[in-house]
Amino acid sequence: MKRSSKFTVALLVVIAALAVIYRVMNSAPSDKLAQSAQVLEIFKDGGCLSCHTDNPELPFYAKFPVAGDIIKVDIDSGYRAFDMTPIMTALENQQSINPVDLAKTEKVMLDKRMPPAKYYLAHWGSTTTDAKKDIIMNWVKDERIKLYADELAEDRAAEPVRPIAQRVNVDIRKAILGNFLYHDKRLSKDNTISCASCHGLNTGGVDNKQYSEGVDGKLGGVNAPTVYNAVYNFVQFWDGRAKTLADQAAGPPLNPIEMASESFDQIIAKLQKDKNLVKAFNEIYPDGITQNNITNAIEEFERTLITPNAPFDKYLRGDDKAISEEALNGYNLFKKYDCATCHVGPNLGGQSYELMGLRKHYFADRGMELTEEDNGRYKETKQERDRHRFKVPGLRNVALTWPYYHDGTRATLEEAVRDMGIYQSGVTLNDNETKQIVAFLNTLTGEHEGKTLTNDNKQ
């Protein structure tokens, strides 16, 4: 046999051997493992923890000059976009998975983004094969079905967006009292401002101002989020400083820029002069009018402020005629361009903190001086990763809640959508795509107390 022929045969043998090794190294986890254990194994073998954590598992070549610089860029980018520590912890402890983590994982699988080629070429066992992808996608669907007790059409059971519930369980007596307190201006220092002043129920749960006016005309530094469907948020306020609706209700009355009361003792002293109100409290709360009881009643009322039966909810439940073809195309674009990796669940948001300017520096382009409010979650944690990171706003009734963003700088949905594409998704939407996504967002306006929500303010 000629030398060249021997070389060719040897080369083919080596290639065949490498192919076998590659297939073995990239085989899917055993189906004898629990579903969560299979997913955990795929994540670990895929090298997810090499980038998506604050304590990455670095390969040996990370110490080399050029390779080390490349790896650092990848780690910084990966960790900014997705911290996988919570999802790994949840899998290891058989806990519920955050819906945003599910959505991000699903999108990565659909787009076959991870791991990047430069990683799996050096780590043969990290490739995401079709078998691994199927395991992940089935797990995402099963987790969503477990997470949400809703009724979706069978072919929509795995959608990242869910319908608003028809009702929530509340203590009706507390809710009625909370409704009264929500509109009571005595919670403010000079009896001029109530919760409804900035979160009007007849104006989409907001005031449609860039910054709300408090006592003496003082302006806040952040755009007022809607009160509708706030019960679905995992925390309250843009910076997440309130864990519950009751915690949130305790903030504005004592905020010197908002309602400016000196203390709840001052508020209680005023309310105790109202004999009917004292009686109402005593009938519900044995200890009468207290700070905790005031905020508890407001919380119970705000739990009733849900807006079910939006056209898109009807579509999710199986009514194909509930939305237009244009709106459906918009929803598909909404998913294609990663919007549905953060705007998930019944409220299409409110489930995570995300970086404003993930793909392009928003604040550098904005042309306004940075404020303390622009620091977002960093205000509370003082962790650098949280700078410019905000609670994702819910998109329910978004057509009624202009202006947009935490700084209220976008007056229309068209502006907000186009710029989200640039700064969060890294895409430039054309006019038709923008129009379609806006059409989808318009299908998210729901009903309150049996009537379609409207806004008395005119844009």
Please tell me what each predicted stretch does.
Residues 47, 52-55, 75, 109-113, ...:
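Sec/Tat-exported extracytoplasmic proteins
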Residues 65, 103, 108, 243, ...:
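Alpha-helix N-cap/helix-start motif at coil-to-helix transitions, marked by capping-box chemistry
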Residues 57-61, 81-95, 99-102, 107-132, ...:
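Axial heme c-ligation environment in periplasmic c-type cytochrome domains
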Residues 33-47:
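Short extracytoplasmic/periplasmic juxtamembrane "stem" segments immediately C-terminal to an N-terminal membrane anchor
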Residues 40, 68, 72, 102, ...:
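Extracytoplasmic/secreted envelope proteins and their assembly/folding machinery
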Residues 1-35, 112-176, 260-328, 332, ...:
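Post-cleavage N-terminal segment of exported redox proteins
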Residues 41, 56-86, 156-251, 315-418, ...:
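Short glycine/threonine-rich turn/loop motifs
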